[in-house]
Design a protein with these regions (language model features):
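Active-site-proximal cap/loop segments of hydrolase catalytic domains
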Residues: 1-154
Length: 154
């Protein structure tokens, strides 16, 4: 949930952060629900599909939960809070990540650019959710620290 958390925090941080870095994060939970090839995790993590009005926060005891205790995780999707984004963001994603498609990172990057927020997209055509190739790892480290140097030294 690291990348998801970064995208969510970008809309809820009240100027506590000078920049953000999101790696393979979920930007739009509804889009993610439909575009992943792995159907078990979205149902487990989110409780059910976006068509459900209320989802139990405890799937094992769903029948014991009343309507006031139900939540809809799709209402906390980071993309719904882009209007609050105001902080530079670096989005990193691997195009061979079939669980969280690169369109999530590309969408977050595009949202930031359209809002006039400084943003950068580091897209690996040959990596999945993990950066495994040594040369790509070096690029990841250099980009990561260059981004921090740029925004934290101001």
């Amino acid at each position: 949930f690291g990348g998801y958390s970064v995208y969510y925090l970008a809309g809820h941080h009240d100027k506590r952060f000078k920049c953000f870095i999101a790696h393979d994060g979920i930007f739009n939970t509804q889009q993610q629900y439909y575009e992943t090839e792995e159907m078990w995790f979205p149902n487990w993590d989110l409780g059910a599909g976006p068509w459900r009005k209320g989802i139990s926060a405890d799937p094992d005891n769903a029948e014991k939960v009343n309507d006031q205790q139900k939540v809809n995780p799709f209402t906390t999707s980071p993309h719904l809070y882009v209007d609050r984004w105001d902080t530079p963001i670096l989005c990193i994603h691997g195009e061979k990540d079939y669980r969280i498609l690169s369109s999530q990172g590309q969408s977050a990057f595009s949202a930031a650019v359209m809002r006039g927020i400084p943003a950068e997209l580091l897209l690996y055509p040959d990596e999945n959710h993990w950066v495994l190739k040594p040369q790509n790892g070096i690029l990841w480290q250099r980009t990561f620290f260059r981004w921090l140097d740029r925004w934290l030294k101001k």
